[in-house]
């Protein structure tokens, strides 16, 4: 059984944990760097990216998360989590992990009142997926190895590079678990080899 952590510093981490547990994995709410060993994957929820950076300042999260990824851990980021994963952040610039070769602009889809729900075409996810956009960021540039799995009005909103999956929307606010299930397939090899045990 895969052990998937959900960074529980802010955002709707409980909804992510519930979705993952419903798929049969062990979901762990992660609040300390010391909880990373033993995990096969980690979900970084949405919220507010500058607030998340402030909350992460109390522990060495950046080197720990980079090390987790380098050792083969799968990482999924939603909305603010996607911002944190990006190589470059603009509007305004801010620190990020650089685990995903994209340039991402904060709050590019508008204010809270501009939030919306839609259905996205995503053949690799089983046809379509439901998506909730809340002050969503915009992916402005993609590296050569980044694959677009779903787009909205021609713009990438769900991307993958190796063992990193990122989306500018909130899948945890829908009834679907397709994206969480896909992430489990990304994390499964680590679970099978036990490389983090």
Label each region the model flagged:
Residues 13, 36, 84, 91, ...:
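Flexible, glycine-rich phosphate/dinucleotide-binding loops
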Residues 44, 77, 167:
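Redox-cofactor binding/interface segments in oxidoreductases and associated redox assembly factors
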Residues 27-28, 75, 164:
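Hydrophobic anchor at the start of a short beta-strand
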